[in-house]
Amino acid sequence: EIRPLVPMIYYHVWDNFPAPHFNRKFYLSNDRICAISKVTRDIVAEVTPEVKLNYVPHAVDSEIFKTLTEEQVLEIRKQHLGKEDQDKVVFFWNNRNARRKQSGSLLFWFKKFLDKVGHDKAQLIMHTDPKDPHGQDLEHIIDHLGLDTQRQVLLSSQKINQGDLAVLYNMIDCTINISDAEG
């Protein structure tokens, strides 16, 4: 038996209510549970109040990732988007280019969206490796769909620091995050 020699700690997430009382025996088999969300913390506290519980936020640094003023956002858009792109609705997809993240499907859906609203009305920024061996060849799909890599779909494949990523999140209008078979 290892438990008398080493404390058992469960780093845990459970995303929604109702509380999974069927997990009680598993929760009790730990000396401490570290919940990565407030929902998980509340669930564990309900199911096993006798188990030591810590809330360990699974999040980003709120000093870096914070909402900027409208004036700051306008200035950032001027600096980072072409003059003809500053009034577009800008979408942002920040994921690994893996099949389960549906990067190729997103490009097809975005093309249909542009066909409906106008090809000069929106832009998609994809922060990913367009040639990831676990994903689709995004450059090929973009070319196949006839999308413009300067105006419609921008690929950002270089590693960037958190400050620059925070700027990107402030500059865009909508974040897209789709995937299949998570967890």
Protein language model annotation of sequence segments:
Residues 3, 128, 135-163, 167:
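Nucleotide-activated donor-binding/catalytic signature segment of Leloir-type glycosyltransferases, i.e.
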Residues 3, 10, 20-31:
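A conserved, positively charged/aromatic
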Residues 39, 59:
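Carbohydrate-associated surface elements
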Residues 66-83:
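A short helix/loop element that forms part of the nucleotide-sugar donor recognition site in Leloir-type
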Residues 83-101, 107-110, 124-125:
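Conserved donor-binding/catalytic core segment of Leloir-type glycosyltransferases
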Residues 94-99, 130-131, 159:
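Short donor-sugar binding/catalytic loops of nucleotide-sugar-dependent glycosyltransferases
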Residues 180:
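Aromatic "clamp/platform" in nucleotide-sugar-dependent glycosyltransferases that forms part
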